[in-house]
UniProtKB/Swiss-Prot annotation:
The keyword rRNA-binding applies. Belongs to the universal ribosomal protein uL5 family. One of its GO terms (molecular function) is structural constituent of ribosome. Keywords: Ribonucleoprotein, Ribosomal protein, RNA-binding, rRNA-binding, tRNA-binding. The gene is rplE. It comes from Photobacterium profundum (strain SS9). This is Large ribosomal subunit protein uL5. One of its GO terms (biological process) is translation.
Length: 179
C-alpha cells in the first residue's frame, strides 16, 4: 500500500472532518483518479513520434496508454477524423497513489524555475489540472534517450463538491501551491 494512501486514511480524513464538519467520513473528499494526457500533433507526419510519446507515457505512468484519435477533421491543422494525435492514461487505485507520491515528492520539485503550482487551476467542481512542459522531470525518463521534449497535462479528479474542499485535500498532502 502506498504511503500517501495510508497517510490519507489516518491523518487527512480526520483533518478534513474537523475543518468542514462532515457528519460521515464518506463525505470527506478523496482522489478518485489521475489522468495524464499527451497531445502529439506532429504525429500526423511522423508515426514514430507517437510511439516514442506512448513509450514515455508508459514509463511515467506504469501502464500502457490509450492512443487518442481526432474526433473530427480540421483542414487548418491538416488532420482527418480518426488520425492518431495523442495518448492518455487514467490511473486509479494503487498506481494512482504511487504516481501521486512520485509527482509531489520527486517530479514537481524538479521543474525548472519552480515557484509553486497555480492555486487557480481548479475547475469549479473540485478537480485540479496542471500542465508539465517537459516529461524529463520524471525520474523514469532517461534524459539521453529522449528524442524530443514533450509536455503533458495532469488532471487530478476528486470527489470534492467545491474548489475549497479540493484545495484543502491537496494542501493536506503538502501540494506545493503558490502563495
Amino acid at each position: 500500500m502506498a504511503k500517501l494512501h495510508d497517510y490519507y486514511k489516518e491523518t487527512v480524513v480526520k483533518e478534513l472532518v474537523e475543518k468542514f464538519e462532515y457528519k460521515s467520513i464518506m463525505q470527506v473528499p478523496r482522489i478518485e483518479k489521475i489522468t495524464l494526457n499527451m497531445g502529439v500533433g506532429e504525429a500526423i507526419n511522423d508515426k514514430k513520434l507517437l510511439e516514442n510519446a506512448a513509450a514515455d507515457m508508459t514509463a511515467i505512468a506504469g501502464q500502457k496508454p490509450l492512443i487518442t484519435k481526432a474526433r473530427k477533421s480540421v483542414a487548418g491543422f491538416k488532420i482527418r477524423e480518426g488520425y492518431p494525435i495523442g495518448c492518455k492514461v487514467t490511473l486509479r487505485g494503487e498506481r494512482m497513489w504511487d504516481f501521486f507520491e512520485r509527482l509531489i515528492s520527486i517530479a514537481v520539485p524538479r521543474i525548472r524555475d519552480f515557484r509553486g503550482l497555480n492555486p487557480n487551476s481548479f475547475d469549479g467542481r473540485g478537480n485540479y489540472s496542471m500542465g508539465v512542459r517537459e516529461q524529463i522531470i520524471f525520474p523514469e525518463i532517461d534524459y539521453d534517450k529522449v528524442d524530443r521534449v514533450r509536455g503533458l497535462d495532469i488532471t487530478i479528479t476528486t470527489s470534492a463538491a467545491s474548489d475549497e474542499e479540493s484545495k484543502a485535500l491537496l494542501s493536506a498532502f503538502n501540494f506545493p501551491f503558490r502563495k
